[in-house]
Amino acid sequence: MKIVLAYSGGLDTSIILKWLKETYRAEVIAFTADIGQGEEVEEAREKALRTGASKAIALDLKEEFVRDFVFPMMRAGAVYEGYYLLGTSIARPLIAKHLVRIAEEEGAEAIAHGATGKGNDQVRFELTAYALKPDIKVIAPWREWSFQGRKEMIAYAEAHGIPVPVTQEKPYSMDANLLHISYEGGVLEDPWAEPPKGMFRMTQDPEEAPDAPEYVEVEFFEGDPVAVNGERLSPAALLQRLNEIGGRHGVGRVDIVENRFVGMKSRGVYETPGGTILYHARRAVESLTLDREVLHQRDMLSPKYAELVYYGFWYAPEREALQAYFDHVARSVTGVARLKLYKGNVYVVGRKAPKSLYRQDLVSFDEAGGYDQKDAEGFIKIQALRLRVRALVEREGHGA
């Protein structure tokens, strides 16, 4: 049997690699995706080979990640439950897509992942896998093995020659990519406890951020960001640049309790500096270029799209149908937003667009601009008709 494993290089997936070989008598191919997590991917590849993988594949997927997954999601204005910009959720279908592709190319019968049986990631990986290859076998060791805790896993690692880090384990789990870093579990499981001050990696503590604000301009073309401060950049380079700018000003920290797809609530702490800047910049340009009813309709549909991404339905027909709508709407989003960053805050201070629907002559108190204020009286009376009828009916009812 041949299995392709999503391999991070950490202790858990190294244990899984050995466990798969023993339990399934299988040849294991390790696949590591570089999506900007900041870890040495080549080291992970070499470690996989030392741990027993027959082959180790490492791919730089940063550009594909941002171009084909993050930017389409951003065109939809997707935010889960009002705060979460979906940094972990959007990475899983990309990883699973390549797991399936490699399995097909290598003639593997199964894929495997290291997601636990309590979280969302198991669903995201597997929904993608089954959507792309309905007959694929998916192995989820956390749902199968008998380890009762961390001590048993470490004992297994030591018995099988898997290096165990000598540094003290972090009191929380962490997942990173080019869009964000997430922190969960451990000391964060108490929703009343403030996150440890030294936990954050992408962002400066807002209290210690520079005392002078920094201005940044983001240019959009047909829905996607293309330049920062006048410099055109590739999708991954643009997001990285905004991460650096936003990070030094403490932008993009979020601490929430969210509803997992599997039914439980969990606390997540996130850093999304570049994504937060892009969210505000996009809305600033949209305020000029989108028709009122289109904007309102888009905002009604965005939460459903965000839910689909969060749950793992990236390759579902309903997500693809919504994407076609959002892509059509985004074609008019061309312009520039100017933002001021200061101690964790993002302030929109300017916006412009070549096809702006904002007409200064219409809103000016000094110019008529073709708008006859007398017309407002009839407009108001028509809008008030149903309200007046309701009031009259209620009054007659009371009189009876």
From Swiss-Prot:
Recorded hits in InterPro entries, A to Z, give:
Arginosuc_syn_C, Arginosuc_syn_N, Arginosuc_synth, Arginosuc_synth_CS, Arginosuc_synth_type_1_subfam, AS_cat/multimer_dom_body, Rossmann-like_a/b/a_fold
The answer on whether this UniProt entry bears the keyword Metal-binding reads no
* Principal subcellular localisation of the protein: cytoplasm
Q: Which residues form a coiled coil?
A: none
Q: Which residues bind ATP?
A: 6-14, 33, 114
Assigned EC number: 6.3.4.5
Kindly name one Pfam family recorded for this protein.
Arginosuc_synth
Entry binding sites for L-aspartate: 116, 120-121
Quick one: which residues bind L-citrulline?
Answer: 84, 89, 120, 124, 173, 182, 258, 270
* Compartment annotation: Cytoplasm
- What biological-process GO terms show up in the record? argininosuccinate metabolic process; L-arginine biosynthetic process; urea cycle
Q: Which reaction does this chain catalyze?
A: L-citrulline + L-aspartate + ATP = 2-(N(omega)-L-arginino)succinate + AMP + diphosphate + H(+)
This protein's pathway reads: Amino-acid biosynthesis; L-arginine biosynthesis; L-arginine from L-ornithine and carbamoyl phosphate: step 2/3
What UniProt keywords apply to this chain's record, in alphabetical order? Answer: Amino-acid biosynthesis, Arginine biosynthesis, ATP-binding, Cytoplasm, Ligase, Nucleotide-binding
Q: Which GO terms describe its molecular function?
A: argininosuccinate synthase activity; ATP binding
A GO CC term? cytoplasm
Q: How does it assemble?
A: Homotetramer.
Which family is it part of? Belongs to the argininosuccinate synthase family. Type 1 subfamily.
The name this protein goes by in its record: Argininosuccinate synthase
Originating organism? Thermus thermophilus (strain ATCC 27634 / DSM 579 / HB8)
